[in-house]
């Protein structure tokens, strides 16, 4: 059953860094990882941009490693092998964009 709940939220703001991730037509996913959650090494066929909102992620890619914290942005070209581990509960935004739609790759 479809329901619309009107008027329960009167204020909602989106961080400009998150808005900047939105393609002309598309979406941004919010992800929450519990402390200790590991996303093992993998790749994507599209460019990926992550913005850390809360917590800390140990982010690894072929040839590098870094602890990422709120405000950090990770730019991953298509095909980049990477993994992450939440060092504390982490919340981050993810945009997956075809290379032509990614302003960071143009």
Regions found by a protein language model. Give the residues of each.
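A short, N-terminal "cap"/entry segment at the start of jelly-roll beta-barrel domains
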Residues: 1-32, 40
